[in-house]
Amino acid sequence: MDYYYDDYYDEYYDHPDQAAARLFHRDLSIEETIKNCVHPSLRFATQYITNFIAINLLFSVLVLIVRKLFPTAQRSLHLLSCVCGAALVYRVIDHGFYHFLQLAVSLYAVQWTLHRWLTGTGRYIKTPFIVIAYGIGNLLVSELLEPSPETWNRIRGTQMILLMKALSLAFDTDDNHSLRSQLTVLSYSGYILCPANIVLGPWISFNDYLTIWKPPAGIEPKQCRSSSGRRMLIHVFRIVTSALMAVGFLLTSNCMIDYLLAPINSWKWVRAYGRALSFRTSHYFIGYLSQCSMMAAAADWHRAEDERSIMLPVSSLYRITSPMAVEFPRSLVQVVTAWNIPMHLWLKRYIFRTTKRPFGTGTAIALTYIISSLLHGLHYRLWITLLTIGSWTFVEHEVRKKLATIYSACVLVGKCPSSCTVHQHKSNSVFCTVINMLFFALNIFNLIYLGCIFESSEGPPDEVQQDKSMFGPWTELNYASHWLLVFAYLFYFVI
């Protein structure tokens, strides 16, 4: 349930000239579309992406140089991270620095106080949960006190990444005294300000951040030198490919969807499909840009195992989103997992697993939904959307589980192996194909319905408007998915 949050980032690239371009009349020719939309978007994308690539490549090179000259001076990593991260924030975010600063400083102060005074005591509430309560409370109060919604919209994603880092740090250092001993003001600052993910994410753990300094093991120096040229070319290819993918999704979101759907946009479901697809492709833009940023900052790009995949290193740190899994979903569970992979892992590791043992599965799922929603701030549309997604995910899982049991068929949420011995009807049978295709169509329908409420061109959501305008796209579609959800829930009890 780590969903729709990337409309926050659209303020980064939705400049006035681009916003005007996206609102152009749908009868523009291809030449006018290129002139009024593609060119402004390309100019901005070039400037914006260059900041990420240049600063992170500089960070990577400096880490390699300093690590070679001073192999034991790990504090150099933190200093470089602080300087490069601050430079990137200064280049791409022009408002709201004080929100970031006060949240980062206060979260460290809270953790330091709790570690100093509560360590070893028989406390009923663990330190990380106190940090969660404080961090989310600080985030919500800051949003309420910020007079400019536009300013908050520019830093919302950065604040969320900062909070996720600090909360994971609270969990990781709660019982790991060895890791806690490495946590100083300088190392904390370097982790929080790491240029690879300070602005757009993704979240990485404190341990993952520290491995930037460690040289790759298992590679002989001569072997490393002999193949370093090839590996460098692969590394550059990956960075360029990710950047081009990001630009492609940005142009698709800003320009091409409107142009291609213009002849048939009089039908409300086509308009809803266009809005939802524009939103999803804007998310893919952010995902591939953050992937590009992470790879540009990878000081250990020459690891031998990275050659197994030319598009992405083996490490899951670099895989942010999977458009194919989202656009062609077997189930909504697959969409939830593939939408934002690092955030899904964060919620699973630190919220769901931590609360499942003491409170049970049901409570753990509810708490995961609540934390996921609150991390995004006061975004009521998103809260309702996440609740709808969670409800659909549960109903789909239970219905398919019942159908698989009754008919002994491979129609579960997860795909059965080709040599499945549990079910009589295999995945390639006619019955299973029909059932799975019906759920595929249902999930495509839900992607349209749930995504159309977010428009990447609308800027920050105006949550003070009446519910009718807030959920206008759903009203236009007669709340079809919600009625279908009720029917599916009743069907679950009937079968």
From Swiss-Prot:
Q: Name any Gene Ontology BP term.
A: protein palmitoleylation
Query: Membrane topology per the record?
Result: Multi-pass membrane protein
Keywords, A to Z, come to: Acyltransferase, Endoplasmic reticulum, Membrane, Transferase, Transmembrane, Transmembrane helix, Wnt signaling pathway
Entry annotated with the keyword Transmembrane helix? yes
Give one Pfam hit by family name.
MBOAT
Segments crossing the lipid bilayer:
46-66, 92-112, 184-204, 232-252, 358-378, 403-422, 434-454, 475-495
InterPro entries assigned: LPLAT_7/PORCN-like, MBOAT_fam
Catalyses: [Wnt protein]-L-serine + (9Z)-hexadecenoyl-CoA = [Wnt protein]-O-(9Z)-hexadecenoyl-L-serine + CoA
Q: Name a GO CC annotation attached to this entry.
A: endoplasmic reticulum membrane
Annotated EC = 2.3.1.250
Using the record for this protein, list the coiled-coil segments as residue ranges, or answer none.
none
The organism's superkingdom is given as: Eukaryota
Show the active-site residues: 376
Q: Where in the cell is it found?
A: Endoplasmic reticulum membrane
PANTHER family linked: PORCUPINE, PROTEIN-SERINE O-PALMITOLEOYLTRANSFERASE PORCUPINE
Q: What does this protein do?
A: Protein-serine O-palmitoleoyltransferase that acts as a key regulator of the Wnt signaling pathway by mediating the attachment of palmitoleate, a 16-carbon monounsaturated fatty acid (C16:1(9Z)), to Wnt proteins. Serine palmitoleoylation of WNT proteins is required for efficient binding to frizzled receptors.
Report what the protein is called: Protein-serine O-palmitoleoyltransferase porcupine
